[in-house]
Each structure stands twice: as C-alpha cells, then as structure tokens.
C-alpha cells in the first residue's frame, strides 16, 4: 500500500512545488516618483502599472511611491543602484555626463512627434546608462510645460537684474546667469516654502508640478517662453531588468510606451487647464515671449551650451544629439 501511495504523494509534492514556483514568479517593481497623487502624471504611472500587469499575465506588480517618499530629488541613481527603488526618475547626475547636459536642452521642438523623439533620445543615452547599471524605461517629457514663474510681473526674461531664480539643472543655471540672475537649487517639494519666505524671486518649473504644489498663491506671474526639450527619464536597475524573462522585459517596455502615448494628450490638456486656473486663483498673469525673441534666446543658449555638450558626450554623440533635436524642430 505504501509503495502504491508514493507516486500519488510525489505528485502532490510536485504540484505544490509548481504552485509555489508560480507564486514566486510574480515580480514586484518599486517605482519612485517626485510627482504627487493630484498630478496627472501619477495617473500615467498607474496606467503603466495596469498595462505591465495585463501584458505579463499578472507576473509584474508595479508599486508606485509618489512625492519623493523613497528618496530625494538628486538621489535617483544611488536609489536604483542601491536597491531603494527599482525604477526612479534620473536627475542631472554627473555619472551620466551626456544625459546630464542634454535631457534638458535649448531647442524649438515640434511636439507632434514627441513620442518618437523621446524614444530616439533614449536610444542615444542607453549605452551611457548601462555603464552605471541603468536601463531607460519611461520617458517623462516636460517640454510642453517647463516654464518660468515670478512673484512680480517681469518685463524681459533675458534681463533678470540680479533676481534669485530656482533652477533645476546645469543648463537652466547657465541661462539664468547669462540673463543676469542668480540660480538657486530647490527641490520640488521645498519650492513653496522657499517662494513664500522670499528665498527666491522666481522659479523655473513645469506647470504640472507648479499646480500640484499650489504655487499660484506665491508665484502668480508666468512667462510662457517655450525654450526647451525636456525629458526626465525614469530608469530601471539593469540587473533587475535583466533578471526578468524575455516576455516580461517586452511587457514592461510595451507598457511604458503605451502609457506614454495614453498620457500625452491628457497631460497637455491638464496643463492648459492648470495655467488658466493658476492665473485666475493667484490674481496674476501669463505672458508669452514673441517668437522672434524666443528663437534668438534659444539660439544664444545653444551656442553657449555647445562646449558643455561636446565635453560631456564626446564629439560623435554630441553631434547625434544635436542632429536628433534639429530633425524634430519646428
């Protein structure tokens, strides 16, 4: 009897092992973002998580951590390398020298083909990212809404006359200095207090982030300059990505691209609404720079930034980046 029962018992054991293996196959991916839950981009990350689960038949579980809860603004590379998060936004980090000086770039971009442009740009920085253990995953394009906000009306953005202006990176700092201002670095969640206390006279920030943190009460005057290509890329730990099955790698990449496509029109509509709401609630105004002046400012910024890009990227990659942006220009 015992000998006859053994195959049955073995079958049960094998069945349990297979079931346990199936449970263990589910991969948790922790995604860290600086945006808060009232930001439309948070909905984009939720869509990404839904698509990743759907395309992987439930094997990928993307967990979203908003409002910089896992790490600070400048700590994305360290967080991903150290396992604090699996996917994080990547700031202007010196370990990614070319990305640092080109992920925000002075350019007159046609955003009709933004998704294709972002994908092509991600390919150009892929090798650099791999060298520090990262894989580009999600493009977070903020070209549409990266603008300037001030406590008082300003006549000429190119004449800041000593104003202290919040900067987000090396390019913006160089532009602020070229316009006679003084750049000040302030993390997104600290901008409101800095503006309220007079630490800064103006800020460079995306409309989405500006609105999410309700900054219209302290910085109600907007200058719509439209000077940049901007892409704060979300990158994944390369070892974590490589450990996924081929099908789940493909599922994750497809989910990222589809979420970008899903978010783009919603993001732009949301930004447009927030500009109107911000001006109305803050009692301020939104002014645009005339096109001839705008193009001259972009050209001057590009010329001053050429040496930085060449040094950081190397001549060949620098030329490829500039050629890419030019090919998607207006």
Language-model-derived ranges and their functions:
Residues 1-10:
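Bacterial N-terminal signal peptides that target proteins for export
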Residues 24-114, 127-330:
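N-terminal secretory/targeting leader peptides
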Residues 117:
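Catalytic cores of large soluble enzymes that bind and process phosphate-bearing ligands
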């Amino acid at each position: 009897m015992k000998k006859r029962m053994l195959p049955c018992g073995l079958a049960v054991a094998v069945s349990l092992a297979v079931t346990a293996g199936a449970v263990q196959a589910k991969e948790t991916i922790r995604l860290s973002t600086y945006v808060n839950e009232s930001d439309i981009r948070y909905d984009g990350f939720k869509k990404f998580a839904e698509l990743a689960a759907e395309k992987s038949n439930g094997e990928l579980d993307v967990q979203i951590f908003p409002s910089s809860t896992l790490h600070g603004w400048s700590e994305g590379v360290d967080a991903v390398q150290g396992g604090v998060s699996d996917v994080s936004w990547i700031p202007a980090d010196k370990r990614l020298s070319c990305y640092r000086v080109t992920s925000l770039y002075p350019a007159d971009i046609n955003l009709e083909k933004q998704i294709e442009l972002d994908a092509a740009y991600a390919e150009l920085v892929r090798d650099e990212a791999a060298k520090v253990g990262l894989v580009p995953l999600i493009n977070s394009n903020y070209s549409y809404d990266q603008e300037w906000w001030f406590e008082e009306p300003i006549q000429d953005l190119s004449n800041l006359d000593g104003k202290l202006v919040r900067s987000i990176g090396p390019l913006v700092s160089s532009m602020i200095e070229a316009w006679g201002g003084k750049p000040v670095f302030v993390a997104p969640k600290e901008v409101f207090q800095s503006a309220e206390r007079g630490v800064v006279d103006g800020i460079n920030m995306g409309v989405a982030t500006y609105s999410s943190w309700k900054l219209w009460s302290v910085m109600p005057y907007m200058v719509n300059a439209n000077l940049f290509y901007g892409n704060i890329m979300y990158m994944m730990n390369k070892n974590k990505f490589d450990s996924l099955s081929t099908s789940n790698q493909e599922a994750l990449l497809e989910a990222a691209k589809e979420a970008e496509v899903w978010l783009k029109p919603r993001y732009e509509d949301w930004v447009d609404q927030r500009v109107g709401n911000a001006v109305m609630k803050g009692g301020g105004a939104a002014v645009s720079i005339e096109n001839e002046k705008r193009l001259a400012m972009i050209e001057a910024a590009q010329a001053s930034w050429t040496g930085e890009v060449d040094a950081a990227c190397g001549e060949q990659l620098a030329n490829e980046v500039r050629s890419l942006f030019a090919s998607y220009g207006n």
